[in-house]
């Protein structure tokens, strides 16, 4: 009897497939079997690319004479630690009674690569191969994936992109790391007084290092500029002799005596304090008490603008947005967030985590009531789920911005499945919090927008010296419809903290109650207002903020912001640095190899001395690796291969040329002498923070004993 073989990426996923398929299976060594089917698994990667010495023993020793290393045909081998499972899977794939293979590895580029390597090394022929592509591990989704499985050949372009990504990382890593280590490794090693220094380079990794170092250098070179704002303490009569105080800010708008003046710092302040004091004196203020003098003519309401504002629920989570929010709210790293998202996926609580999409597919939208219905069993959001179902507010979701098939490549956004609640008790506190924010973000799209009433006041202050008057501005806002805010506020935050998080990064405005709003709305143009005093508020410009782990992930996702050329920016739109599946791992590696430092309490990321030294080495030798535009264009090319718009041959030719040309350039360079000066220039910023020995000055650098240039560092 012919059998079906289901091959998953890991044992736990294989178990879920076995349960969903409902075959009476017996456990074997490395697989499960029934009369109708076999379910087996990989344990992640079973096959890897061979080291250079497998091609020829001469490549084992690092030497510039053997670079560039670009094999015509790439070699692969079974990973020794998992050889037993590979042999089991290989024998099953080749069993005579197996006629159809269902590929159930992760539904993405890397999952495709894992299986294709196994198939390649197992040397399979004459079998039907079907690809199971699913968005969650619920029973219904697994059965749908099996039922609708397509011929594996339809995923050949995706497999080609996966192979090319691996070849790219392999060739750039081996050639550039060896070339730079042989050329500059001793200089790095000697400067840091280490036993050895291997310079690790990668297409994405080095670019991310460059982003962090560039930001750090921007902060160092930033010169704070003081500025001085003038504010007025006004009042609004509330009746019964009571008054509501408010602060208005002066701005040099059109009509001001200081409009376009070179004395200004922007529109709302002065570069020097004396000029701010001059404004106050001319308006009738007596310094330093701030009391108004007889020269003051009055403050009059010139304009009262009323405006209704609404804010729609945010788009759903993709992995980058989830990692950013978890870094901000919980101070957990992107790598930890991905592990949690993967755990929630494997426990059937949420959908596939490694997604770039922030919307739903139209097909999912038709069945979305099932996901909502399941959340009635999740206490923190149960009432909201019930309300959505009772009011049928999900029925028109397909016509909103939250559903868009064109914005989905492999998977839709991360949402709750509405199932798997038996696993909730086993979740860690961090995992439970992440699940709750995913559930709340999902339910919020079925709620109306928040609506606020905003009132903007323009107050004209006149004096004998400034009869035309100077204008002060204030804004007030009151929330009139909560909309989605209630469901989006996590249960584990106080409302005060949540409000702070919600307003994070928004323009500051004065909030008010509805009684005050009603008074504001009745005020008329020309009405005189009390002005009790004027004052100067000193401020200073702020340097750029350091990246935190979440903001760095988002920046990697949106690499186009670094590109000034509009045409090029448009070309790589939608392609970031790395992918949703790899960004967290790249960041983790940079921290592990001590090129970057991650503060676990704040999630702030900074370069280390060694990381900044490596940046200088790369900048002096293979500078394009630091260019986000180039890195994003490589990723765009891989997307083109996956979509069938670029052939594997075209991409490989480009890769071959880049690696060959850049490696040969490094071999011809003789610029090592400038490195110590560059290292000395940055070392002072690290001596207090790092425990490395005090670094010698540039004048003594030449006295260091160096090994031969072509020795391994």
What are these regions (language model features)?
Residues 2-3, 104-107, 197-198, 306-315, ...:
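Conserved short loop/turn motifs at secondary-structure junctions
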Residues 13-24, 40, 188, 194-233, ...:
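NTP-handling and nucleic-acid-processing catalytic cores
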Residues 74, 96, 137-234, 307:
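C-terminal or mid-to-C-terminal helical accessory/interaction module adjacent to the motor/catalytic core
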Residues 191-200, 212-276, 329, 353:
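C-terminal helical "lid" subdomain and adjoining coupling/linker elements of P-loop NTPases
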Residues 2-6, 28, 93, 99, ...:
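Basic, low-complexity terminal or inter-domain segments flanking catalytic cores
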Residues 1-178, 543:
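Intrinsically disordered, low-complexity regulatory segments
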Residues 260-315, 323:
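Metal- or metallocofactor-binding catalytic centers and their adjacent structured scaffolds
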């Amino acid at each position: 009897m012919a059998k079906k073989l289901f091959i998953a990426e890991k044992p736990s996923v294989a178990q879920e497939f076995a349960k969903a398929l409902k075959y009476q299976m017996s456990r074997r060594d490395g697989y499960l079997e029934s009369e109708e089917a076999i379910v087996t698994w990989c344990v992640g990667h079973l096959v890897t690319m061979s080291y250079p010495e497998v091609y020829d023993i001469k490549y084992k020793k690092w030497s510039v004479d053997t670079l560039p290393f670009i094999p015509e045909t790439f070699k692969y081998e079974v990973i020794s630690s998992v050889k037993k499972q590979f042999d089991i899977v290989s024998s099953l794939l080749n069993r005579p009674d197996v006629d159809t293979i269902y590929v159930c590895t992760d539904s993405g580029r890397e999952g495709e690569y894992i299986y294709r390597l196994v198939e390649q090394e197992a040397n399979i022929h004459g079998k039907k191969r079907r690809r199971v592509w699913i968005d969650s591990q619920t029973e219904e989704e697994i059965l749908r994936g099996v039922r609708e499985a397509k011929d594996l050949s339809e995923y050949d372009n995706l497999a080609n992109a996966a192979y090319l990504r691996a070849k790219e990382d392999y060739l750039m890593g081996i050639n550039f790391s060896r070339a730079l280590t042989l050329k500059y490794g001793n200089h790095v090693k000697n400067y840091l007084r280490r036993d050895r220094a291997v310079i690790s380079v990668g297409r994405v990794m080095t670019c991310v290092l460059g982003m962090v170092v560039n930001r750090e250098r921007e902060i160092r070179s930033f010169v704070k500029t003081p500025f001085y704002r003038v504010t007025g303490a006004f009042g609004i009569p509330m009746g019964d002799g009571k008054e509501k105080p408010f602060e208005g800010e002066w701005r040099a708008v059109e009509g001001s005596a200081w409009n376009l003046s070179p004395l200004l710092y922007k529109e709302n302040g002065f570069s020097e304090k004396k000029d701010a004091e001059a404004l106050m004196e001319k308006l009738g203020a007596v310094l330093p008490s701030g009391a108004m003098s007889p020269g003051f003519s009055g403050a009059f309401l010139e304009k009262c603008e009323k405006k209704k504002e609404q804010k729609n629920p945010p788009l759903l989570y993709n992995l980058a947005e989830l990692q950013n929010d978890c870094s901000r709210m919980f101070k957990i790293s992107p790598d930890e967030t991905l592990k949690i998202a993967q755990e929630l996926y494997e426990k059937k609580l949420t959908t596939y985590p490694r997604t770039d999409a922030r919307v739903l597919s139209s097909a999912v939208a038709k069945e979305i009531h099932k996901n909502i219905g399941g959340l009635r069993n999740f206490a923190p959001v149960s009432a909201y789920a019930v309300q959505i179902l009772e009011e049928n507010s999900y029925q028109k979701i397909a016509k909103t911005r939250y559903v868009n098939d064109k914005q989905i490549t492999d998977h839709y956004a991360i949402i709750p499945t509405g199932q798997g609640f038996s696993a909730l008790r086993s979740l860690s506190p961090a995992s439970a919090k992440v699940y709750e924010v995913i559930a709340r973000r999902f339910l919020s799209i079925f709620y109306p927008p928040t609506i606020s009433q905003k009132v903007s006041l323009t107050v004209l202050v006149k004096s004998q010296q400034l009869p035309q008057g100077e204008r002060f501005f204030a804004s007030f806002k009151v929330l009139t419809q909560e909309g989605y805010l209630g469901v989006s506020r996590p249960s584990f935050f106080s409302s005060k903290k949540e409000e702070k998080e919600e307003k994070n990064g928004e323009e500051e405005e004065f909030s008010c109650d509805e009684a005050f709003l009603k008074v504001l709305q009745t005020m008329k143009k020309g009405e005189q207002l009390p002005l009790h005093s004027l004052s100067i508020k000193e401020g200073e410009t702020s340097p750029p903020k350091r990246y935190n782990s979440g903001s760095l992930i988002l920046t990697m996702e949106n690499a186009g912001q670094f590109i000034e050329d509009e045409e090029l920016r448009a070309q790589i739109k939608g392609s970031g640095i790395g992918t949703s599946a790899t960004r967290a791992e790249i960041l983790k590696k940079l921290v592990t190899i001590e090129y970057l430092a991650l503060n676990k309490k704040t999630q702030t990321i900074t370069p280390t001395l060694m990381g900044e030294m490596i940046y200088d080495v790369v900048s002096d030798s293979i500078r394009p690796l630091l260019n986000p535009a180039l890195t994003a264009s490589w990723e765009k090319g891989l997307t083109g291969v996956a979509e069938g718009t670029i052939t594997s041959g075209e991409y490989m030719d480009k890769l071959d040329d880049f690696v060959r040309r850049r490696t040969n350039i490094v071999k011809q360079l003789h610029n090592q002498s400038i490195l110590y000066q560059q290292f000395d220039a940055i070392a002072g910023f690290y001596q207090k923070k790092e425990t490395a020995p005090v670094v010698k000055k540039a004048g003594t650098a030449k006295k260091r004993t160096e090994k031969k240039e072509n020795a391994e560092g």
